[in-house]
Regions:
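Short, charge-rich amphipathic interface segments used for partner binding and complex assembly
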Residues: 16-67
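Short, charge/polar-rich alpha-helical segments
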Residues: 1-22
Length: 67
């Protein structure tokens, strides 16, 4: 069973990770807009999609921790 302290620590880490991923998604969006190479743009898009999926999973984890 997870203690309240452990839950709080996990929540703090998830929130920090969420913020970091949000920034990376924004960075990739900017790169995607200025990229002139189609292959590079496709790789950037794919990376952004993977980060969005990770972000959604983190949000679900936060919701689960909050009950």
């Amino acid at each position: 069973m997870i203690t309240e302290s452990e839950r709080g620590e996990a929540l703090e880490r998830l929130i920090a990770l969420r913020s970091s991923i949000e920034k990376r998604i924004a960075d990739l969006e900017q790169l995607e807009q200025v990229s002139e190479d189609e292959e590079e743009t496709a790789r950037i898009y794919d990376a952004r999609i993977y980060l969005i999926i990770a972000f959604e999973n983190i949000v679900l984890g936060i919701k689960e921790l909050l009950g």
